[in-house]
Amino acid sequence: MIFLFNQSPLTTKKLDTLLKVAPAGTPILLYEDGVLSAKQGTAVSAQVTEAVKNHPIYAVTPDLDARGIKSIIPGIQLVDYDGFVGLVEKENPIPWI
């Protein structure tokens, strides 16, 4: 399974809930506004830095670029759209809404 997260951590606390309930080792894919969670120096940076220790976390590069995010939390893996599709095909995707 892979959790798909596309919401801004600036407008919702759903990332907090996801990180609490996701079983250790379960991948998390950040896309659309969800990539804001990957940015260093935000209110959720410490939480995401800890989460990287227990989960493979991916961020979609074109979504980071579209939002001008250059500095991401170490350990977050970058994927392009083909990588996004590959992860979703490989894992059972669960959208986090």
Q: How does the language model describe each region?
A:
Residues 67-97:
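C-terminal structural segments of small proteins and small subunits
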Residues 41-47, 78:
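Charged helix-capping and loop-helix junction motifs
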Residues 2-4, 29, 96:
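Structural motif
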Residues 35-39, 65-69:
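Short, charged/polar "capping" segments at the starts of alpha-helices
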Residues 20-24, 47-54:
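Short, conserved loop/helix-junction motifs that constitute active-site signature segments
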Residues 27-32, 55-62:
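Short internal beta-strands
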